[in-house]
């Protein structure tokens, strides 16, 4: 596989294992890059003719090179903000959280609000922390800390007081206030109830948002990620940051923006989306997707299920969760979005939300006929077995977050006991692939790690990286082979991002977006998949991340 070597290459990588991820899953040992595109892929000897006096040559010494990873569902602005604020993602346990929060409050006395997040529900009884713990640390300043999945918030009494949330406050239609027996708020807010307090927090400044995106982009590049789909784009926040960076030439990643569908509005949004797509597509940023939030999460019983949750002791309840968008309206709106070329990016956790999403796509197909909008459903935690083959039949990609597919506290204590036999329908990655679905992958960072290699390890092993050898795999029959997990983070996500014409594989003529790893990824004797590190990330042949070990 080679182009004419009339001009020397700008970059040559040789002596490695090049996972081209082309349709034949071909392997090579070297590649050459010229003018941002791949000029040659093949054996070392085929590349030698492309080396000139100014060619940068990197000797791989057996290390693996892959196409640049693409995250199909991520929140880099939020992830960057989390790293700039009270960051709890790397902390576990009530006492440890309180220590971090107290230290942050002491170090930032001028901040009007203490904001941040990353706490785990299973670190608290019933998954619900209390306001009194925060009151002891910050009685005079409002505290607003989201949990790791962003579907709940821990607040103090001052925040509730400022927002006027009391025992008399009704739950919003799309959320729930945790309460004591007398109706008083405990300090945990779920889903739409978070906005009862969050709306009073200071707006993020453009400078804050741009700094967060710069930080998030650098972090993702350090993990080999060269493209992503941002799963929530709002006009005054994320969109403004992307357009600012892209306009200055500082957006080095390729980004698809999924514009947020306001579930309290209707079809009038579509004309606004069309205009935003036109005026905000700058450089490597393109707003061509629309995010549809179908439900919540299982741990707080807001994930939409076809049948009710159990009560934890095997008894039935009347709670099927929250379907946040009316199915009848959704079918009409999705048909209109599809007709003007928008991709649908669904959040669907429960089997009821997954089915409603598939039904809406079916309605769009009936109304419009085939299209290349490539709808995808993110999270897909519980899928009714009858719906698995519908992904291929309807041309819907399965957008998986594999880091969640394991036994851990939230799974074992807050999910499985309330599902009954349906717990065996969770994260059916292998079944989806066997049924012919396109499988893409993402991290949902800052909900969980954005490291694609750790995510791939979970897809292959279905055991948490910190409990290897201690716990059984979650539904081991749904494990993927490593090559299929890698494909999901490269070719699959490139397909979802409509970037597969130029990226996703390492083939002659395609853009030289690639990741260099610190070892042979497929030599399982070299350590766990998740222990592999990225030492170099390139976009169009230009380094956007380099570890000293790249040349060492």
Residue ranges: model-predicted function:
Residues 3-15, 19, 23-272, 292-353, ...:
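Divalent metal-binding segments
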Residues 66-72, 378-379, 440-443:
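Active-site neighborhood of phospho(di)ester-bond hydrolases with catalytic His/Asp-centered motifs
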Residues 245-249, 276-282, 370, 392-393:
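Acidic (Asp/Glu)-rich catalytic clusters
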Residues 252-290, 374-381, 385, 411, ...:
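Phosphate/diphosphate-binding loops
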Residues 282-302, 396-406:
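Non-cysteine beta-strand/loop elements that form the S-adenosyl-L-methionine
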Residues 332-345, 352-375, 385, 389, ...:
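His/Asp/Glu-enriched, well-ordered alpha-helical/loop segment
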Residues 546-552:
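Glycine- and charge-enriched low-complexity intrinsically disordered segments
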